[in-house]
Curated annotation (Swiss-Prot):
Positions of post-translational Phosphoserine modification: 70, 161, 214-215, 271, 278, 294-295, 297
InterPro entries: HMG_box_dom, HMG_box_dom_sf, HMGB
Molecular-function annotations in GO: DNA binding; RNA polymerase I general transcription initiation factor activity
Domain of life where this protein originates: Eukaryota
Keywords: Cytoplasm, DNA-binding, Phosphoprotein
GO biological process: transcription by RNA polymerase I; transcription initiation at RNA polymerase I promoter
Taxonomic source organism: Schizosaccharomyces pombe (strain 972 / ATCC 24843)
Segments of skewed composition (Basic and acidic residues): 131-178, 200-226
UniProt protein name: HMG box-containing protein C28F2.11
Length: 310
């Protein structure tokens, strides 16, 4: 019983301690809850990001356009010129403009021949010329809009009957025939002009050589004194090939000294120590080969003899 009572006391003491700790935790949580608004308020003032003032997009675009246009206007603003400087500029203005146009046009497009006939208009082009004023009046406020005018023109052309179209088509065909005739005449005249130009150039080239021969220049004339030393030098120094050709060839002559009185030259003979006899002369090798062949043939022809039992 005493042991049980001690255990119960220990358990009750632990419960009381837990209750005290729980109360302490609750009080700490309540204090934190009370202090949270002040802590969050202080942090929010510091951590707020910078936000620029919102402006209307239309005003922003206007400001950007003004900033872009202002330096260009300053750069292109004309200065007041003095009357003394204006006078020579006015005198040369017509010449400068013509030169500028002539320098810019050749790079873009070839100059058109004024004598070349222009292409005739089509039936639809003739219809446009006749009906453009009426269609503009019918459109009213939209008469200045090119897209609307062309659209109405196309619709009206599509709604025309075959008889109405024939008048424009016949007129266009007549203009086309006249254009073809004019173009044929233009091409023929162009070919004749090219043939005439080729003849003129051929005549000029044919007359040039005769003029050159008839009138020699100073460069073609050379003094005889300048060429004379060269000719003398060429005669005095013949070619190397001619020198070699003129040289006589040597003839090999035999000696007339009698050979009987001349002693023969003794050649050095090898010492006997240096002479080594060949161990196997070729004749000995041949005999050995013959013996081997004969022994092989005899072994093949003579079969082995069997032993007879006594």
């Amino acid at each position: 019983m005493a042991q049980n009572s001690t255990q119960l006391e220990k358990i009750s003491g632990s419960f009381t301690r837990l209750a005290e700790a729980f109360q302490l935790a609750l009080t700490a949580c309540r204090e934190i809850e009370e202090s949270l608004p002040s802590i969050l308020g202080e942090k929010s003032e510091v951590s707020k990001p910078f936000k620029p003032a919102v402006t209307d997009p239309s005003n922003a675009k206007k400001e950007i356009n003004m900033a872009i246009e202002s330096p260009s206007k300053k750069a292109t603003s004309p200065k007041k010129a003095t009357p003394a400087a204006v006078a020579p500029v006015e005198a040369t203005s017509a010449v400068d403009t013509s030169e500028a146009v002539a320098s810019m046009t050749p790079n873009k497009r070839k100059a058109r021949d004024p004598a070349q006939p222009k292409r005739p208009p089509s039936a639809y082009n003739l219809f446009q010329k006749n009906q453009r004023s009426e269609i503009k009046e019918s459109l009213g406020e939209k008469s200045n809009d090119v897209k609307e005018v062309n659209k109405a023109m196309h619709e009206k052309w599509g709604s025309l009957s075959e008889d109405d179209r024939k008048t424009y088509e016949e007129e266009a065909s007549k203009l086309r025939e006249a254009y073809e005739e004019e173009m044929a005449a233009y091409n023929a005249s162009k070919e004749n002009a090219s043939v005439a130009d080729s003849r003129v150039t051929a005549e000029e080239t044919s007359t040039k050589p005769s003029e050159d021969l008839s009138s020699p220049t100073k460069k073609d004339l050379i003094d005889f004194s300048e060429t004379r030393p060269l000719a003398q030098a060429s005669r005095a120094t013949p070619d190397i090939k001619e020198q070699h050709a003129k040289k006589p060839k040597r003839k090999h002559t035999r000696s007339t000294v009698p050979t009987s009185n001349v002693e023969p030259v003794s050649q050095p003979q090898p010492s006997p120590d240096k002479i080594v006899s060949s161990p196997n002369p070729p004749s000995a090798k041949r005999e050995k080969k013959k013996r081997r062949k004969s022994s092989m043939s005899s072994s093949i022809t003579t079969p082995p003899t069997a032993k007879v039992a006594n």
